[in-house]
UniProtKB/Swiss-Prot annotation:
InterPro entries: Ribosomal_uL5, Ribosomal_uL5_bac-type, Ribosomal_uL5_C, Ribosomal_uL5_dom_sf, Ribosomal_uL5_N. Belongs to the universal ribosomal protein uL5 family. Signal peptide: none annotated. This is Large ribosomal subunit protein uL5.
Length: 178
């Protein structure tokens, strides 16, 4: 909860003054963090999906739910209703704990890291990033994984624009590319 206290004491005041808000309730905040791990061959091999669920459970501290295909796609050999990945939505204390772990531990462990692109905002202040290796998280034991998998992380804010979302994440020293 250290990062939440930092948000309450420093970030709120800094953003309120920067954007000239009348109330601190107008200041953008992080609402949720969504982790998604797609497992393309999950319909053929159930073990792959089990390993992905296990990895995501270790990373997030919460049990993920299995996502299923909405439509059948012949080229990808996917049928409607077949499992294709797993997903976790973090809110509250777990969200702040994961966000701190992401900024302080996981992102610095990325190989050849030169900063995150600013272009990954969606137009409404939400930020998405993709991680190529799950082994950057300290909970994943390198010797026990079956395959290196990537995951998608979406940080959802209640910011009204990308400029506000960028200011919010930059206030937490999020490592954006200069």
């Amino acid at each position: 909860m250290q990062l939440y206290d930092f948000y309450k004491k420093n970030v709120l005041i800094k953003l309120k003054n920067k954007f000239n808000y009348k109330s601190i309730m107008q200041v953008p905040k992080i609402e949720k963090i969504t982790l998604n791990m797609g497992v393309g061959k999950a319909s053929f091999d159930k073990k792959l999906l089990e390993h992905a669920v296990n990895d995501l459970t270790l990373i997030s501290g919460q049990k993920p739910y299995i996502t299923k295909a909405k439509k059948s796609i012949a080229n990808f050999k996917i049928r409607q209703g077949h499992p294709i990945g797993c997903k976790v939505t973090l809110r509250g204390k777990l969200m702040w704990f994961f966000f701190q772990k992401l900024i302080c531990i996981a992102i610095p462990r990325i190989r050849d890291f030169r900063g995150l692109p600013v272009k990954s905002f969606d137009g409404f202040g939400n930020y998405s990033l993709g991680i190529k290796e799950q082994i950057i998280f300290p909970e994943i034991d390198y010797d026990k994984i079956d395959k290196i998998r990537g995951l998608d992380i979406t940080i959802t804010t209640n910011a009204k624009s990308d400029k506000e979302g960028l200011a919010l994440l930059s206030a937490f020293n999020f490592p954006f590319r200069k």
